[in-house]
Each structure stands twice: as C-alpha cells, then as structure tokens.
C-alpha cells in the first residue's frame, strides 16, 4: 500500500489557525462506515447520535508548555521541544540548532535566558537534558515554556492557547500535542450527555511530537511508528466489557483513544481487553481488524499521515477519501483547531481492496 494513496488537495485557507468561539460550535461531518452515507451538521448533534448506555472514551492527557527558546552558553541559538518528562529534573527533547549540542553543553533557556540546563546524552534523535534549577520540570515549563502549537498553525502561540489548546477535562500533564477531537466538548455538552445516560471513562495517552512527523517511506508497511505512553486502567476495561455485554457502542473520542484501546486489546491474550500501562507503537492502517471501538469522533487529518490511515482502516479507504473530498468541497476547517467527524465503523473495511 502506497503512502501516496492517502493524499488529497487542501487549500491553505481551510487550515484553521484559531478555534471556533464556542468549543461545541464547530461543524460535524457524519460518516456511516457501512453505507458510506454522509450527513452535515454541527458538533452538538453527537447528542442525537449516542444512546443511553453508550460509552464515550476520552483521553485526559494535558498539554504541557513544551517549547523553550534559548541558546548554548557558547552563543548559538536553539529551540527545545520537550518530548517526554523523565523525572523532576530531566527531559527527553528535540533540539533545533545550527549545530547539535554535545554532551556536557551548558544551555541558557527561556525568553530571558534565566534557566540553566545541561545536555547529558543523546538518544537517537532525542536529547536528554537536565534542568539545573530547584523547581521541578513541570513548574519550569509552566513558567517559561510556550504552548507547542502544531507546525501547520502558522502563528506564534498566544496566552489564550494555554486554555484553548487544552480539553476541558485534561488532568494528566505530559502531552506535547492536544487530543484534538476532545477540544469540541464543553461542560454544557458533557452535562447533556450525562443526563441522557451516556457513560464516560478516561484513558491517558501522552501525545508526542511524532504525531506530526511525515511518513518518510513510499510503502506504508515500511513505516516505523513512534512510541507514546498509554494507560488503560481497570475501570475503563470494566466499562468497555459492560458496554459490549449490553449491546451498546464504545465511542472513542479521538485517534489517541483508539490507539490506547486497541493497544490494550492487542496486548491481551485471553480477554477482549485488559489493563494496559506501557509505551505503544501500534500502527493502524487498512487491513487492521478493530477489536474494541464501534464509533469514532475525530478531526480532519493531514494528507499522507498515519492518522488518515487509521481513519481509513476504520471507515473504509474509499469512504474516507470520499468524505475528505466532500469536506474540502464544503469548506470544512481542517486539523487541530478545525471541524470534526462522527464515524460509525465499517465492519467490512479490513477486507477492502485498495488498488
């Protein structure tokens, strides 16, 4: 299967650089995976698409202000993007500089270069950095870090992004990108869903910068997926099994919830799903057989990305590419701050032939 099979033309003006004034006020394109039928609406229509007893699975990760600017003590400017917090003093990070810092290099970080740090070691493309400060890593990032807006949002981060690029239910700091499908849920919508009898549980997957990396191979089977840490606790497992037993739908809010649930199912030997606390490198593309997720709420994704491949595996390749063509024609807003889709799984997608 070729990466180029997943391309589509997207005018620049359809990339959303700011969210809608009201979280739940975005447009919603609904796709019935089994029939391919498309319907247009607004995000609050999800209330009508869910029944009492259905289970919404959210990702409660919280985005950290992971981008720091500074320089080497010797003078060269650099940009640090924290990928993973190792402990109270150390992080793994991407470093962009004219010349990569060597082991032992002293760094001066922050807009006023007030924070001293040391480059301890290099691990492939990531740098292990120690913050030489009495504060813990998360406090430091909160003080001097910038929100790590995706590369396709062509503007500097603003103070408002600290709230807007965060789900209202986020509580586990560690992500460097938001689980963007969840950005559309506000408290009134969540309360209306609860009143209807829709159940809610939370997984945690700390989204890494790898989610924005292009697929650099021609054949998708050759792609090596980046690793992200995920947690699927016992209460989620119990809720999923109970939902399936009563014949209701498990609805994943975002591709990160999909990857968490399906990772837990894949790692399980005897049951449908079991608790999971580990890194996952699950790569979902057409031919993948979903075990857990019945419906998916997701934003529109980049051409040739692993995420549009995941959606194609869920809804069917032809259905997905047709839906994206329709979204472009109808001028939907794309990517992190854009509009959303509600997709019912296509049970035949794993058998679909892609020419």
From Swiss-Prot:
UniProt-listed Enzyme Commission number(s): 2.4.99.17
Major site of localization recorded for this protein: cytoplasm
Domain of life per record: Bacteria
GO cellular component: cytoplasm
Compartment list: Cytoplasm
Keyword Methyltransferase: no
Molecular function (Gene Ontology), one example: S-adenosylmethionine:tRNA ribosyltransferase-isomerase activity
PANTHER family listed in its UniProt record: S-ADENOSYLMETHIONINE:TRNA RIBOSYLTRANSFERASE-ISOMERASE (PTHR30307:SF0)
Assembly description: Monomer.
HAMAP family, per the entry: QueA (MF_00113)
Family assignment from sequence similarity: Belongs to the QueA family.
Protein name stated in the entry: S-adenosylmethionine:tRNA ribosyltransferase-isomerase
Organism annotation: Photorhabdus laumondii subsp. laumondii (strain DSM 15139 / CIP 105565 / TT01) (Photorhabdus luminescens subsp. laumondii)
Taxonomic lineage from the root: Bacteria, Pseudomonadati, Pseudomonadota, Gammaproteobacteria, Enterobacterales
């Amino acid at each position: 299967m070729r990466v180029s099979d997943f391309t589509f033309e997207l005018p620049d003006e359809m990339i959303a650089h700011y969210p809608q004034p009201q979280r739940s006020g975005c447009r919603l394109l609904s796709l019935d995976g089994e029939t391919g039928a498309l319907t247009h609406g607004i995000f609050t229509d999800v209330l009508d698409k869910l029944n009492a007893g259905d289970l919404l699975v959210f990702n409660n990760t919280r985005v950290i202000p992971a981008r720091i600017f500074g320089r080497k003590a010797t003078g060269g400017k650099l940009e640090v993007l924290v990928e993973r917090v190792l402990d109270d003093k150390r992080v793994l990070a991407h470093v962009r500089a004219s010349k990569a810092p060597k082991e032992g290099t002293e760094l001066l970080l922050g807009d006023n270069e007030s924070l001293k740090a040391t480059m301890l070691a290099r691990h492939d493309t990531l740098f292990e950095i120690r913050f030489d400060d009495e504060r813990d890593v998360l406090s430091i990032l909160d003080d001097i870090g910038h929100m790590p807006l995706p590369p396709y949002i062509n503007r500097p981060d603003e103070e408002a992004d600290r709230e807007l690029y965060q789900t209202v239910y986020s509580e586990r700091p560690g992500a460097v990108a938001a689980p963007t499908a969840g950005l559309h849920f506000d408290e009134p919508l969540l309360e209306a869903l609860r009143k209807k009898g829709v159940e809610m549980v939370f997984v945690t997957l700390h989204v890494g910068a790898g989610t924005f990396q292009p697929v650099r191979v021609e054949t998708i089977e050759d792609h090596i997926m980046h690793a992200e840490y995920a947690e699927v606790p016992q209460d989620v497992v119990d809720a999923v099994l109970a939902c399936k037993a009563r014949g209701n739908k498990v609805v994943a809010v975002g591709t990160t919830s999909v990857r968490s649930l399906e990772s837990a199912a894949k790692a399980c030997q005897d049951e449908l799903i079991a608790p999971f606390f580990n890194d996952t490198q699950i790569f979902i593309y057409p031919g993948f057989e979903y075990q857990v997720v019945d419906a998916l709420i997701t934003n529109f994704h980049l051409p040739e990305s692993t995420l549009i491949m995941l959606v194609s595996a869920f809804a069917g390749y032809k259905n997905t590419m047709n839906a994206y063509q329709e979204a472009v024609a109808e001028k939907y807003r794309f990517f992190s701050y854009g509009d959303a889709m509600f997709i019912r799984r296509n049970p035949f997608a794993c058998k679909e032939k892609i020419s």
